[in-house]
Regions:
Chain A
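C-terminal transmembrane helix and the adjacent membrane-cytosol boundary/short C-terminal tail
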Residues: 2-8, 26-32, 37-48, 102, ...
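Membrane-interfacial helix termini and adjacent extracytoplasmic/periplasmic loops
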Residues: 4-5, 67, 122-158, 192, ...
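Periplasmic/extracellular loop-to-transmembrane helix junction in inner-membrane transport proteins
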Residues: 5-10, 23-29, 47-82, 94-103, ...
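Alpha-helical transmembrane segments of multi-pass integral membrane proteins
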Residues: 34-37, 44, 76-81, 92, ...
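Faces of alpha-helical transmembrane segments in polytopic inner-membrane proteins
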Residues: 41-44, 87, 109-119, 143-170, ...
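Transmembrane-helix boundary motif in ABC transporter permease subunits
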Residues: 59, 79-110, 123, 127, ...
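Membrane-helix interface segments
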Residues: 98-106, 134-135, 149, 179, ...
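Glycine-rich helix-loop "coupling/hinge" segments at transmembrane-helix boundaries
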Residues: 127, 222-248
Length: 282, 201
């Protein structure tokens, strides 16, 4: 009787374990399916766009408007990336190293542009540079126009992409062990010399990948750019313009061109990332 | 000369308490004590990586307490060497050197001439430590702080390197504070400091 009871309780435990394993497997499968659906949703429209639009890329590249838009986009995105790198690196470095007064305020300011809609960012910059403000009228008095110029495009791109640079560069600096800097200091380096001779070279791959993300973000910016400069047209504005005037067929080749152009830096970025994983930094 | 007078410091949860000691000019002092007793923290404090909360640090008789590391005349060999991975062996040794003759003599004496063109990430643990030692000596420091610099060397190599180091110390006259767990290293020192729970006992 006791033995039978023992057996039945063991059978019960086994059944329980099996049910548990089945539930676990079901949960696992569900998680995979949900993840796969999202991945498909992210990838398929882009693949479709390139597949259907690729045939028109050749023609698009013979269209002077597209060529001009590509040129404007690359020049302004490169300008925005350079400004983000030059002005953003010191901020990124400070955030990665020191705990100082106002650190959280700086971090919040840096995150701010990520939280507001991009057209709103454009409107905010428009307010700053309009002739109604002292700053805007001073710029205009000096003959420096922002609205409707490459400078406006750069300003819009910088506003939305600089935070990405700062956060990626901050990670790149944080990965460099501070002891390297300290050893350089004991070997006679000033803080700046140690940064230039040790920290910067050790962070260079991370900084390069930060710059690529920034550039790709600047190239694909639409909302803030369109508010500040409908003309000269960047590629994203041109594709929107063609879409509203000529429909999907007109917009598709340009959209495909833009995607192909933004895929190139992303592939370069992946390559850098894989490289970095094998690199010894500590 | 290295002098700490009533030095207190706090790094994270870890404290250095009322540390007072003197290592006279040209003396090789061993600093021993259990793991996590504050030995490395004390070296970093003397070298200037950490500022004390109170107390005075003197190097060569000069108060360096508030001074940046690059003005202290201290050579520092951290545990594991911390060779700059983006530079080769030669560039590492030359990093803070004032003249090429010193570099040439150091590399010859410590037997690392054949490693000069190598990538430092490809060196063995022992080779890295010797390179790090040479790099710290190249600027001709007044004081050398060593954090278990010979731990990765086999016994033979260890004895050779230690002999060469002692000979160089007599010639150049620098002062040494040497953190070690090795009893034979500690015996080769002329002064012995023992640290426990953040204090010199």
């Amino acid at each position: 009787m006791r033995a039978a009871g023992h057996r039945s309780s063991r059978a019960h435990a086994n059944a329980h374990a099996a049910a548990h394993a089945a539930a676990h497997a079901a949960a696992n499968t569900t998680a995979w399916v949900l993840g796969a659906l999202l991945l498909l949703f992210l990838a398929v429209p882009i693949i479709l766009l390139v597949a259907l639009g690729a045939g028109g890329v050749g023609n698009a590249l013979r269209d002077p408007d597209t060529i001009a838009a590509l040129e404007t986009t690359f020049v302004t995105a490169t300008g925005a990336t350079l400004i983000a790198a030059i002005c953003g690196s010191p901020i990124a470095y400070a955030l990665s190293r020191a705990s100082f007064r106002g650190r959280s305020v700086i971090a919040a300011i840096v995150d701010l542009p990520l939280l507001i809609p991009h057209p709103v960012a454009g409107i905010a910059i428009l307010l700053l540079v309009s002739r109604d403000t002292a700053f805007g009228s001073a710029l205009l008095d000096m003959g420096f126009r922002v609205v409707g110029t490459p400078a406006g495009i750069i300003a819009a791109m910088l506003f939305v992409s600089a935070p990405l640079y700062i956060s990626a560069a901050r990670e790149a600096f944080a990965r460099v062990d501070r002891r390297f800097e300290f050893v350089a200091r004991t070997l006679g380096d000033t803080p700046w010399a140690a940064f230039r001779r040790v920290t910067l070279p050790l962070a260079r791959r991370g900084l390069a990948s930060a710059a690529i993300v920034t550039w790709a973000r600047a190239v694909s910016e639409f909302g803030a750019v369109v508010v500040l400069a409908y003309n000269p047209k960047v590629v994203s504005v041109l594709s929107y313009d063609r879409f509203t005037t000529g429909g999907l067929g007109q917009a598709l080749p340009i959209a495909a061109t833009l995607v192909l152009v933004s895929i190139v830096p992303l592939i370069a970025l992946r390559a850098l990332k894989y490289d970095r994983n094998s690199e010894v930094v500590s | 000369m290295i002098e700490c007078r009533d030095v207190n410091a706090r790094v994270g949860n870890f404290a250095i308490r009322a540390v007072t000691f003197v290592v006279p000019q040209g003396v090789h002092a061993a600093l021993t004590g259990p793991t996590a007793s504050g030995k490395t923290t004390l070296l970093e404090l003397i070298a200037g990586a950490i500022a004390p909360r109170s107390g005075i640090v003197r190097v060569g008789g000069i108060d360096v307490t508030g001074r940046p590391p690059e003005t202290r005349g201290i050579g520092f060999v951290p545990q594991h060497g911390y060779l700059f991975p983006h530079l080769n062996t030669s560039e590492n040794v030359r990093y803070g050197a004032r003249d090429p003759a010193t570099v040439a003599s150091l590399t010859r004496r410590f037997g690392i001439e054949h490693l000069m063109d190598r990538t430092v990430t490809k060196l063995s643990g022992g080779e890295r430590q010797v390179v790090a030692l040479c790099r710290s000596l190249a600027p001709r420091p007044d004081v050398v702080l060593l954090d278990e610099p010979f731990a990765a060397l086999d016994a033979d190599r260890r004895a050779t390197v230690l002999n060469e180091f002692s000979a160089l110390q007599v010639e150049w006259g620098f002062t040494v504070l040497h953190v070690t767990h090795d009893e034979s290293d500690a015996r080769s020192a002329t002064l012995r400091l023992v640290m426990s729970d953040g204090s010199i006992t």
